[in-house]
Amino acid sequence: MTKPIKTEVINTPPHGRFGFVRKFDIHTGFDIYCSDGEPVFAIEDGIVTDISHFTGEYTTPVPTPWWENTMAIAIEGKSGVILYGEIYEPSLRIGDKISEGQHIANVKRVLKNDKGLPMSMLHIELYIHGYRGDWAVWNIEEEKPNELCNIETILSKIYKL
């Protein structure tokens, strides 16, 4: 497995970790804070299964205009479907074969307003094999969506969390 962001230390605060209960929802992924434009690499071999809007005014079912417009790419490999979000539009296409360690995208600044928090991050989620559909929303007081898995099980093998 390859690190998606080439850093030795991840300084992810609790609110950026999988399963953290936020004001309006529960966090569905893991945020790796980094610079705008930071290269993103594939964790494992796979095939591109989706490229879509992730944050901003074009997201569905609920637009998030308080965030910048960002994209996501999903790659299905041996661990399941890994979503890499909060990126610039990638040059890859659905159906492309991806090799572990291949440059797949670049991180895009997601926050519009500086509130003293990191403004750019790679947001990563993990889904069951074969999943195709809308990316999970995990509402407070609801069970974790069945298709959503804890990405930290993979990240803990390649980073110290």
Regions found by a protein language model. Name each.
Residues 34-36, 77, 88, 128:
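Short, flexible loop/turn elements at secondary-structure junctions
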Residues 43-91, 115-123:
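Zn2+-dependent peptidoglycan hydrolase active-site motif and core
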Residues 33, 76, 85, 99, ...:
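Residue-level detector of conserved, well-ordered beta-strand and adjacent loop positions
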Residues 38, 78-81, 131-132:
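Short acidic/polar mixed-charge low-complexity motifs
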Residues 8-44, 51-64, 70:
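Short glycine/threonine/proline-enriched tight-turn/helix- or strand-capping micro-motif at secondary-structure
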Residues 39-51, 92-107:
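Short, well-structured beta-strand-loop connectors
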Residues 1-5, 90-102, 109, 117-161:
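Acidic, glycine-rich catalytic/binding loops that coordinate metals and/or anionic ligands
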